[in-house]
Swiss-Prot record:
Record has NAD as a keyword: no
SUPFAM superfamilies: Ribosomal protein S5 domain 2-like
Gene Ontology cellular component annotations, sorted alphabetically: cytosolic small ribosomal subunit
Region (Disordered): 123-143
Pfam families per record: Ribosomal_S9 (PF00380)
Gene that encodes it: RPS16
Record-level Gene Ontology MF annotations: RNA binding; structural constituent of ribosome
Organism: Eremothecium gossypii (strain ATCC 10895 / CBS 109.51 / FGSC 9923 / NRRL Y-1056) (Yeast)
GO annotation, biological process: maturation of SSU-rRNA from tricistronic rRNA transcript (SSU-rRNA, 5.8S rRNA, LSU-rRNA); translation
Entry keyword set: Ribonucleoprotein, Ribosomal protein
Ranges of Basic residues composition bias in the record: 134-143
Name listed for the protein in its UniProt record: Small ribosomal subunit protein uS9
Family to which the UniProt record says this protein belongs: Belongs to the universal ribosomal protein uS9 family.
Domain of life assignment: Eukaryota
């Protein structure tokens, strides 16, 4: 019995983490066990579709993608999902298809939006004393 070719990648945004399992299959794409067409909020659904629409659905015809996402808010989770899918597709093509198709995918993704493959490294600034937040100060009175 031969093992099914598969790769595992992750995408991150703020505190949201999405792990994508990409393997040979028949074109199923699921997020937390439900189809990608049911991603909420509906307004951000096309953000999740971006990697699929950029390279064409024909590249997804013979692979299955299962994504598990935890942490963060709705928007962060959507960005983590799209990054995990894009990175998973590139990794799958590098490992099981060929280098040329991997480079084409990478070029298409990075020319459209760099954050599809590279995580956003911005993090919240720590709070300091003398104010309510990182930069906000308490009101000062002179009299």
């Amino acid at each position: 019995m031969s093992a099914v070719p598969s790769v595992q990648t992750f995408g991150k945004k703020k505190s949201a983490t999405a792990v994508a399992h990409v393997k040979a299959g028949k074109g199923l794409i699921k997020v937390n066990g439900s189809p990608i067409t049911l991603v909420q909020p509906e307004i951000l659904r096309f953000k999740v579709y971006e990697p699929l629409l950029l390279v064409g659905l024909d590249k997804f015809a013979n692979i299955d993608i299962r994504v598990r996402v935890t942490g963060g808010g709705h928007v962060s989770q959507v960005y983590a999902i799209r990054q995990a899918i894009a990175k998973g597709l590139v990794a799958y093509h590098q490992k099981f298809v060929d280098e040329q198709s991997k480079n084409e995918l990478k070029k298409a993704f990075t020319s459209y939006d760099r954050t599809l493959l590279i995580a956003d490294s911005r993090r919240p600034e720590p709070k300091k004393f003398g104010g309510r937040g990182a930069r906000a100060r308490f009101q000062k009175s002179y009299r």
